[in-house]
Curated annotation (Swiss-Prot):
GO terms for biological process: regulation of signal transduction. It is found in: Secreted; Nematocyst. InterPro entries: Anenome_toxin, Myo_ane_neurotoxin_sf. Its main location: secreted. This is Delta-stichotoxin-Hcr1c. Keywords: Disulfide bond, Ion channel impairing toxin, Nematocyst, Neurotoxin, Secreted, Toxin, Voltage-gated sodium channel impairing toxin. Belongs to the sea anemone sodium channel inhibitory toxin family. Type II subfamily. It comes from the Eukaryota. Transmembrane segments: none annotated. Binds to site 3 of voltage-gated sodium channels and inhibits the inactivation process.
Amino acid sequence: GNCKCDDEGPNVRTAPLTGYVDLGYCNEGWDKCASYYSPIAECCRKKK
């Protein structure tokens, strides 16, 4: 699904970043967002 980064989240490289939920490594209770357009742009957001 679509995902938008939280500015205050960890690992924010490009925020707010719109992309997809990636099963990467974020802290428990967070989702990892990965950009559609940039493979190196990623961040974590609090699970809704």
